[in-house]
Amino acid sequence: MTIIDSIGGATAPSYSVLLEGPESTVCAEAPIAAHDSTAYQSEAELEDELIAQLVEQGYEYADITDEAALIANLRARIERLNGFAFTDPDWERFFRTHVAAETDGIVEKTRRIQQAPVIDFTLDDGTIRNVMLLDRDHIYRNSLQVLNQYATSAGAHDNRYDVTILVNGLPLVHIELKRRGVELRQAFDQIERYQRESFWSGTGLFEYV
């Protein structure tokens, strides 16, 4: 797969366009190779290999299978990043108003991460805290985790996600794996289907993807 910058004006051979945006285009570069049984990998094997590589690079594997565990992990990671512990009422209010507000969608959540990852939050005791969702100045303080096969049944349809990267507990990256011989476009279609059917479900944390 090649990402071709559409602004640069460079010409390229005729490729099959998968996705096209205002600043970049994703194309399929190489034709599907002839099947080689000795090199065949199932999607499960690809998934295991990817996770093993990420763990070797310092990612922590997170055994998270439901939203309650996802939220509990998010709280722990944000508390560790900021060096203090929320009381339960403070966390509930922070989560519901600044992380997973019912009125927020993909645009608002993307803007929060991209433009305002530090939130001024007043605790119940009157103390004002600058709560970071992401530390841009000291990137190695951020927590990186990987989880797989997260299942959701609260959306329009039941879905199970291949691999998710958590940054400080927030699901920011989704990876959909396809075995050799399957068109790459199918992975993009599947992610788009998740956006329609289930990323918004529950508290909508997967809308941060």
Give, region by region, the residue ranges found by the protein language model.
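An alpha-helical interface "stripe"
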Residues: 2-209
